[in-house]
Amino acid sequence: MYTAIILAAGRGSRIGFRKQFATLCGKPLFMHSLEKVLDIFEEVILVLPEDFLDKVKVHPKVKKVAGGPERQDSVFNALLQATGDIVVIHDSARPLATKKMFLEVAQLGDYHGKVVASPARDTLKEVVEGKVIKTLNRSLIWHAQTPQAFRRDILLECHMRAKAEGFVGTDDASLLERYGYSVGVVEGSYWNVKITYPEDLEMVKKIMGCEED
């Protein structure tokens, strides 16, 4: 069985407000991702700020779980409630992820996990204190996105090990990498942008044709 986990518990520290509840084309931002997974996966978990659990009304199929102080804590809380053999984790701040991405990343094959990612287009520099150290090999660099999918037992083990040693990864795949598990890649789309700043939200509105929001 598959479990989809939609993360919508962020504080919005960089954008200045809880972006998951911002209106995008007539509905809350998080709802765009939630609606895509409802008819794909058997179990759906929506991770919310604890004080929003009773305020947010969703489909009866959706299990609401309180998030934690950080993203990693929120995923861990959801994993404890998930029952699927494979979990598909997605940041609600990426409303342009397609159903095709969710379906493809969930097919793990021989991997312990898979991520949606896009090959780097720009020349990338390693910079320390304002000084360019070297140019990275662009052909080896991919921009990781979500959704990401994992064997639940493996990801839960990695989360527990990370918690024990105080390690915080920037995404869930980084935990598997740290502990020697295999992670595959599904090529995503450059349109699958993450809304981090106000201008990102305005750009996505233009892409979706709902600038009037």
UniProtKB/Swiss-Prot annotation:
One of its GO terms (molecular function) is 2-C-methyl-D-erythritol 4-phosphate cytidylyltransferase activity. This is 2-C-methyl-D-erythritol 4-phosphate cytidylyltransferase. Catalyzes the formation of 4-diphosphocytidyl-2-C-methyl-D-erythritol from CTP and 2-C-methyl-D-erythritol 4-phosphate (MEP). Keywords: Isoprene biosynthesis, Nucleotidyltransferase, Transferase. InterPro entries: IspD, IspD/TarI, IspD/TarI_cytidylyltransf_bact, ISPD_synthase_CS, Nucleotide-diphossugar_trans. The gene is ispD. It catalyses: 2-C-methyl-D-erythritol 4-phosphate + CTP + H(+) = 4-CDP-2-C-methyl-D-erythritol + diphosphate. GO terms for biological process: isopentenyl diphosphate biosynthetic process, methylerythritol 4-phosphate pathway. It comes from Aquifex aeolicus (strain VF5). Its EC number is 2.7.7.60. NCBIfam families: ispD. Disulfide bonds: none annotated. The record marks 14, 19 as: Transition state stabilizer. PANTHER family: 2-C-METHYL-D-ERYTHRITOL 4-PHOSPHATE CYTIDYLYLTRANSFERASE, CHLOROPLASTIC.
